[in-house]
């Protein structure tokens, strides 16, 4: 059994990965495919479109928003690499 020797070892001070952090979202292949298709046509979404996609894919708006932010960063990085390779 774990003994608390110092006051800072109380639950308040002990950090757990699950406390305060959200777990990583795993997208199904179907969700990923639909998100990629949408990204192909629009890199930025209106709020209305984000709500539609969230409802269709059973995700929340925040997940859609963050997926698109991450995908834009990946796209930006990939285009930089391609332009360096062509020089």
From Swiss-Prot:
**One of the protein's GO biological processes:** anterior/posterior pattern specification
User: Could you tell me which InterPro entries the record lists for this protein?
Assistant: Antp_homeobox, HD, HD_metazoa, Homeobox_antennapedia, Homeobox_Antennapedia_CS, Homeobox_CS, Homeodomain-like_sf
What's the chief localization of this chain? nucleus
Q: Where, by residue number, is the motif Antp-type hexapeptide? A: 5-10
Q: Which UniProt keywords apply?
A: Developmental protein, DNA-binding, Homeobox, Nucleus, Transcription, Transcription regulation
Name the DNA-binding stretches.
20-79
Q: Which SUPFAM superfamilies match?
A: Homeodomain-like
Record has Transcription as a keyword: yes
Tell me yes or no: is Oxidoreductase among this UniProt entry's keywords.
Answer: no
One example of the protein's molecular function in GO is: DNA-binding transcription factor activity, RNA polymerase II-specific
Where is it localised? Nucleus
Q: Which PANTHER family match?
A: HOMEOBOX PROTEIN HOX, HOMEOBOX PROTEIN HOX-C5
Entry's family note: Belongs to the Antp homeobox family.
State the function annotated in the UniProt record.
Sequence-specific transcription factor which is part of a developmental regulatory system that provides cells with specific positional identities on the anterior-posterior axis.
Report what the protein is called.
Answer: Homeobox protein Hox-C5
Q: What is the lineage of its organism?
A: Eukaryota, Metazoa, Chordata, Craniata, Vertebrata
The gene designation is: hoxc5
